[in-house]
Amino acid sequence: MSKKYDKLGNDVFNKVEKINSELFTLTYGALVTQLIKDYEDIEQVNIKLEQMGYNIGIRLIEEFLAKSGIGRCSDFIETAEVIAKVGFKMFLGVNAHVGDWDANRKEFHLTIEDNPLIDFVELPDQYKHKLYYSNILCGVMRGALEMVQMKVKCTFVKCTLSDDSTSEIKVVLEEVLSDMIPVGYD
């Protein structure tokens, strides 16, 4: 299954329109810097980045589904592989790796070896292990998965900007949402 999604991720990445990665990275850095100035409390910056990502994710899922041609995943394991091999490749140009599944297959860790959001970035010591610079990614995944009926909680557990060897996000499936149409919307 993983090889299939590796190929699909590469195929979709080669077809989508791209922007200059340095411009993207520097623009994101300016956004984070402005949030730090606006909020002063680093935890509020983390929350705001996650909320911004959520708003992006609920819209990005439509583009993802349209351009990738992927239908409904059979289970959470397949969903994790699609996120790692197709989603991250399509939108960030990198692959992520899925691992550390719990016994119930409701929780996994997503490892990003080469996070493009942190190029050219060095965190001051007072922000290490406090500011989750790429927290927008957690929000994007939460928003996108909610649109396909999965309520998840995403949290950064490791960040290379805080001297960890990799960037790692913990994803927990909290609930599969009902896809019943609300009364009066038929």
From Swiss-Prot:
Keywords recorded for this protein, A-Z: Endoplasmic reticulum, ER-Golgi transport, Golgi apparatus, Transport
UniProt lineage: Eukaryota, Amoebozoa, Evosea, Eumycetozoa, Dictyostelia
Keyword Endoplasmic reticulum: yes
Protein name: Trafficking protein particle complex subunit 3
Physiological role: May play a role in vesicular transport from endoplasmic reticulum to Golgi.
GO biological process: endoplasmic reticulum to Golgi vesicle-mediated transport; intra-Golgi vesicle-mediated transport
NADP as UniProt keyword: no
Family stated for the protein in its record: Belongs to the TRAPP small subunits family. BET3 subfamily.
Annotated localization: Golgi apparatus, cis-Golgi network; Endoplasmic reticulum
CDD domains: TRAPPC3_bet3
Gene3D superfamilies cross-referenced by the UniProt entry: Trafficking protein particle complex subunit 3 (3.30.1380.20)
Complex formation: Homodimer. Part of the multisubunit TRAPP (transport protein particle) complex.
UniProt source species: Dictyostelium discoideum (Social amoeba)
